Amino acid sequence: MEDFHHISVLPDEVLQALSPRSGGVYVDGTLGGAGHAGLILTASAPDGQLIGFDRDEEAIAVARERLQVFGGRVRIIHRNFAGIAQALAEIGVDGIDGFVLDLGVSSHQLDRDERGFSFMHDAPLDMRMDRSSGQSAADLVNTLPEGELYRIISEYGEERWAKRVASFIVKARDERPIETTLQLVDVIKGSIPKAKWEERLHPATRTFQALRIAVNEELKSLEEGLEGLLSLLKQGGRGAVISFHSLEDRIVKEGFRAAATGCTCPKELPICICGRVPRFKLVTRKPITAGEAEVAANPRSRSAKLRVVEKI
């Protein structure tokens, strides 16, 4: 696994947001290359604890190797963070001092041809984060009704040409199954008028994003995982979430805002009757983004947005 590479985005900003301390219990719900996890463990020495989750078996193997220097201070679990609250309850953890979620697809996943995430190389059309379960992208494009394909590409990819893309996919699969990434790329290119291709965006970008989100149920996982993690934060504990596209950022923004909302009674009422009090405060009113130096060193950080919330 020496070739596993992934540069964690906004590392200093995450560390500053969480302010890890000795004796604290922290969760990294998206271990990846263990970059954020290693920083948290180092900052929380000598006895801070970290519990890491990832649904990708390759990431789990790499994290175990890279974090073994921290010994018993780290526990690694191969599991989607959607079920994080239950997983923590199973190991006797009922409260945490901080958590981080980095929602980006790792450089390793994108660059490994056989994973099927990239439209730049030919590979089996897979896109599963956890290859031991669930349907692949090929399963979806070859079996879903045209209307459902349209919904996925439009809703998850925010693709203006979704209707044509879905129609062309169905026509192509009627001739032969779409089994590889470049097969799908050719179909997408044929469906979008070349004069309408965006200058700095590959024509397959939005459709590939949509299929990846659908295959891995990413938005559903985010909603469930975020709710579970917020419920476990101790007073003064902080949650930091890095998103990479508007759909994710909207869920995080609305989830944090709802948690930080107090009375919802109509303004004309003289007193509060709803009894709702804010449980959290927003540490970041606007998301933190990468600076010029980080973007130059790691172009994938360009679209990253970090939001932070604190339990009160």
From Swiss-Prot:
Subcellular compartments: Cytoplasm
Any one Gene Ontology BP term: rRNA base methylation
EC nos: 2.1.1.199
Signal peptide as annotated in the record: none
GO CC, one annotated term: cytoplasm
Main location class: cytoplasm
Alphabetized SUPFAM superfamilies for the sequence: Putative methyltransferase TM0872, insert domain, S-adenosyl-L-methionine-dependent methyltransferases
InterPro entries on file: RsmH, SAM-dep_MeTrfase_MraW_recog, SAM-dependent_MTases_sf
Positions of S-adenosyl-L-methionine binding: A34, G35, H36, D54, F81, D102, Q109
Keyword Nucleotide-binding: no
Reaction catalysed by this enzyme: cytidine(1402) in 16S rRNA + S-adenosyl-L-methionine = N(4)-methylcytidine(1402) in 16S rRNA + S-adenosyl-L-homocysteine + H(+)
Assigned keywords, A-Z: Cytoplasm, Methyltransferase, rRNA processing, S-adenosyl-L-methionine, Transferase
Residue ranges of coiled coil: none
GO MF, one annotated term: rRNA (cytosine-N4-)-methyltransferase activity
Family: Belongs to the methyltransferase superfamily. RsmH family.
PANTHER family on file: 12S RRNA N4-METHYLCYTIDINE METHYLTRANSFERASE (PTHR11265:SF0), S-ADENOSYL-METHYLTRANSFERASE MRAW (PTHR11265)
Function: Specifically methylates the N4 position of cytidine in position 1402 (C1402) of 16S rRNA.
Protein name: Ribosomal RNA small subunit methyltransferase H
